[in-house]
Amino acid sequence: MFGLWDSYPVAPGYALVIPRRHVSSLFEATSEEQAELLEVLTAVRSKVLEAHSDIAGFNIGVNDGRAAGQTVNHLHIQLIPRYAGDHPDPTGGVRHVIPGKANYLRA
């Protein structure tokens, strides 16, 4: 497993965690590999926070399958830093990928 800065970051500090063994899906990784992915993800998060002290939160994502937006056929976990004010209303987070599903809270 290893972490690296994304070549096309959507935000400063955007990083990836990637297994060395080829698997397309998180569900193809062994339980040991899944545990190691989380350990490396935690270490990468620490490095990202050292480099960008103004981070207010993170989105952590895996696009698993073409319908989910996977364009690289190799498992990678995306660590996307979020900054105060970077989106007018972040409520709903990744639910925004499906139109009309982000606002699930009732007044």
Regions found by a protein language model. Give the residues of each.
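HIT superfamily nucleotide-processing domains
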Residues: M1-A107
